[in-house]
Each structure stands twice: as structure tokens, then as C-alpha cells.
């Protein structure tokens, strides 16, 4: 009996290994491509006239429309009803804050580089903790506050001490331009609320993940489309992509990888848990920063290198401490990274 048991155990380990390779490869590939495409679309000029794509809300519309179509197909394929589980206004509230989150994210890329933005996203721990306390009445450990402080400190160092040669194509100011930082602060605040309210919605209703994805993204599609019409940006955006087919291809690929990343994220969390996912996401962020620096020639100052070490060192420490903890209090865990949320591909 011992030999068959050992054979079965070896097969299970091999099966789990291949699942891990599939999950890690999927997340790394889709979200790294997503990050690079974001920066390319918003910061690299198109055509002989060197025109910049400036309609960030159009990107939100394309992303959400693609995700809503795929989630609807997933619900129909699994023979689950499309009826809303929660009141529609709650889906709309998530949609509004998510649109504001994503718009701030794309707009910020006009003034700060992708490495700055990616590292700044790590500072979302503080707004998430604030919203978690206000909305969910959560209580956090002293270690959580320490990690949040260190991550914010590292992000501040990274933003305040840019390399002198990395200048925004939209503005002659440095990366610590007031407008760029203000957009990132808006992103962090709106994203923290979105993540916390999504968490409350999942716990308050017996809800399938695809149900929430479908209704929030369909609301986001309608709202972003309305915003494009009211601002008069829909026709200029369509005209731009019709003149620059490479931009249209980039936007289509961005929407595709953003949607695909959600399925890899859901699969990873369901198969390996949130802690393993957190470690993968931290590694993905580090890889994205390094690739962006190489691909788009972003110089890093030595202060920024120190800030990066502080941020990623703190995040890895947080993951390993929680993994070793025998009694991880679920109520004290911070919500997942923004890409873990159903609406984020945003990555």
C-alpha cells in the first residue's frame, strides 16, 4: 500500500506544480503586458506627426465593455441566471468609483512614469485600512500599520527623488509634478473605497464573482460611454484610432489581457489562496517596473532604488509573516491588490 500512496502523492505534487506554473505564467504574462501597453498608449506618440492618445475614458469604456461581454458569456455557459443579486444602485456605486479610479490611473501616466505609478499603487494600504475601518469596522494589527508606514515611506522616497532625465512627454515638470501626484492620490482614495465596498458586497450577498463582474462592468460601460458623449471625446477617440491602426490594436490587446488576467487571478486565489497570490503580485509589480525601465529607458536614481527595496521588502515580509502565522485573523487581512479585484486588470 505504501508504494501506491507514494506514487499518488508524487502525481499530486506534479499536478500541483503544473497548476502553479499555469497560474504564475498567466498572471505574469497578462499583467506585465497590460502595464507596458498602458504606458505605451498614454505616453508614446503615434504616427508621423507624433500624436498622443489623450482619451483615457475611452480606454475605460473598451476595457469594461470587453469584460462585461466575457462575464456574460461565462454566466450563460455555466447556465447561471443573469439577474442581479444586489440592488442595482450598489453595482452602480462600485462602477462610478471604479471609473474614477481607472481614469485617474490612465491620466496620471501623462505626468508620471509607469514605474512611479506602479510603486505608488503599493501605498494603497493606508486608504484601504481607513475605508475598512469606516465601512467594515475592521481592526488591524500593529504589524499592518508598520508595513503600511514603510511602504508609504518607500513610495514617497521613490516619487520625491526622481532621476533627472526622466521627464513627462506632456509636461516639462519632473515626475513629482503636483498634478501627477494629485491624480495618484485620487486613484488611491477611490481604489481603496472600491475594494472595500466590493468586499462588503460579497459578504452581504451570496454572490457569484461573474455576477458582480457583469453588472459592475456593464454599468461602467454605460457610464463611461455617457461621459465620452458629454465631454465630446467619443468621436475624437474613434477618429484617432481610425487614423492610427496600431493604437487600435494596442487598445484591443489591452482590453483582452485585462479581461484574461481576471480569470488567472480568480483561478490562482481559488487554487492556492490569497497569500500565494500576494507574493505573485508583488513579484509581478517588481518585474513590471524593471521591464518598463528597460523598454522605455526610464533612469532610476539611487534614492529610487532604496525606495523600491523598502517597498518590496516590506510587502514580502508581510506575506511571509502571514504565511507563518498559525491563526491568521480573516477580519484583519487587508483586501487583495487592485488586480485581484474583479474590476481590475488594472491592472
UniProtKB/Swiss-Prot annotation:
Sorted UniProt keywords: Antiport, Membrane, Sugar transport, Transmembrane, Transmembrane helix, Transport
An annotated Gene Ontology molecular function: antiporter activity
Spans through the membrane: 17-37, 57-77, 116-136, 143-163, 177-197, 218-238, 247-267, 293-313
Start and end residues of each stretch annotated as Disordered: 325-347
Compartment(s) where it occurs, according to its Swiss-Prot or TrEMBL record: Membrane
Main subcellular location of this protein, as a coarse class: membrane
GO cellular-component term (any): membrane
UniProt record similarity statement: Belongs to the nucleotide-sugar transporter family. UDP-galactose:UMP antiporter (TC 2.A.7.11) subfamily.
Entry function: Sugar transporter involved in the transport of nucleotide-sugars from cytoplasm into the Golgi and/or the endoplasmic reticulum.
Protein name according to UniProt: UDP-galactose/UDP-glucose transporter 5
